[in-house]
Amino acid sequence: TPSHMSELLNVAHRLGATSLRTYTRHIGTVEEMMQKTVFDLSVVTGEACDLDVIIVLENHEDFTGSELLDIVERVDHPNLKILYDYGNSQMVLEDPIESLKVVLPYVYSVHFKDHVMIRADDAGQLTVAGVPIGEGFLPLTELTRCLLEQGLRRFTFENVWSYSAPIQEGRKALNGVNLGHGAFAYLDPPFDPARLVLRHSAHSPETLVDLEMCALN
């Protein structure tokens, strides 16, 4: 909400932070979510400017690159930029490279991570799952090269072991997406829990901590 964003903008300012990352929490149709997000951001971008903080809107499992671009251009404020996450476009069945091409001029910072796809038969529904960097199917080299050539240096390395998210309901595969191939290649079972975990309840908390340390090492 704008009031929550205002509070966090002031926290960021007091900490000396130059940016504040956010993503939409709205529900509804895609257009409804976009309209509400535009409204919220339009309320707080002026305050962000006064505090010298850049708001970065993440492609957080909800919007395609063109939808995210549309939001930023509707708000039309220099203190609103985009946080590009390497894999989150997969949840809306958009190729990560195609998504980056669309939003690149507005990208301010980056989440660097790796993903695999899990078949519906193996996960209950078509699912994106996080794995240690380098063990997934995202085009890490090509994405990184494109971002570096654009001058981006704000990279955050994300540990997404045991993270998973379903494909958003109602989304259809966009141009360049071929399920089972490329960035959308399926990982075949059995699944090594040191690589990914789909069902946390199958392990004790102590085992999960040990497995995560194994994944990180």
Place the predicted regions along the sequence by residue.
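Short, flexible loop segments at the rims of nucleotide/cofactor-binding pockets, characterized by
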Residues: 33, 58, 87-89, 132-134
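Short, acidic/turn-prone active-site loops that include or flank metal/cofactor-
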Residues: 25-27, 84-88, 114
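Short, basic, helix/turn surface patches
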Residues: 21, 43-54, 84-88, 137-141, ...
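Active-site flanking residues adjacent to catalytic metal/cofactor-binding acidic residues
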Residues: 57, 84-85, 113, 157
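Active-site acidic/histidine proton-transfer and metal-coordination neighborhood
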Residues: 1-82
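Histidine-acidic metal/acid-base catalytic patches
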Residues: 65-79, 90-217
